[in-house]
UniProtKB/Swiss-Prot annotation:
Source organism superkingdom: Bacteria
Species this chain originates from: Escherichia coli (strain K12)
InterPro entries xref list: Cellulose_synthase_operon_BcsQ, P-loop_NTPase, ParA/MinD_ATPase
Described purpose of this protein according to its UniProt entry: A C-terminal pseudogene fragment of BcsQ, which has a premature stop codon at position 6 of the intact protein. The mutation prevents cellulose synthesis, and has polar effects on transcription of downstream gene bcsA and probably also bcsB, bcsZ and bcsC. When the reading frame is restored cellulose biosynthesis is also restored, see (AC P0DP92) for an intact protein. May play a role in subcellular localization of an active cellulose biosynthesis apparatus at the bacterial cell pole.
Name this protein carries in UniProt: Putative cellulose biosynthesis protein BcsQ
Amino acid sequence: MRGGVGTTTITAALAWSLQMLGENVLVVDACPDNLLRLSFNVDFTHRQGWARAMLDGQDWRDAGLRYTSQLDLLPFGQLSIEEQENPQHWQTRLSDICSGLQQLKASGRYQWILIDLPRDASQITHQLLSLCDHSLAIVNVDANCHIRLHQQALPDGAHILINDFRIGSQVQDDIYQLWLQSQRRLLPMLIHRDEAMAECLAAKQPVGEYRSDALAAEEILTLANWCLLNYSGLKTPVGSAS
């Protein structure tokens, strides 16, 4: 929906919760910011990733990292300053990742492939989104997201997940009540504001690993169970659309 709503943190947290429920999970960073790795204790100086490998003519599969016996991570990789400023020069060279992920899906090695997608409208983002059997649009309950819900198209069939909900905020409560009446794809659970969500990135861990007793961690676990009940009839992957 927009940057800063917590998509990357929730992607990491959902991946952790699904593997805690016994699922085999691959979490893929499709954002050039390359931040997802920092939620899985990867060194800041680690430059490798699937996109970096493709741009350097290397095998993208070698960029995968093991976090737990049931959770693997595929970072994006670090771009140079010039690459960051000129994405049109390299984005078209990344399309092979789509066939690679399709092969992984068909292999059955992972029951869930979570893709942290950027909010841009690039070709590679659209290609990756088209691979996803399901998508979650992460929103904050504020006027900004309310406006965007009416002027930005969501992916077909996307569900809307509220993050950073503040108890006691009158404007949030008003907007939330409006959404309950108007947003038919709103998920039946939400993620409340929790300091643990801010702390976990500093600790370089998913929130459920950092503080399993935190309210947000319990709510993400509820989300994971909901995904199992509603998305996993054929063990299909979930994508997160920002």
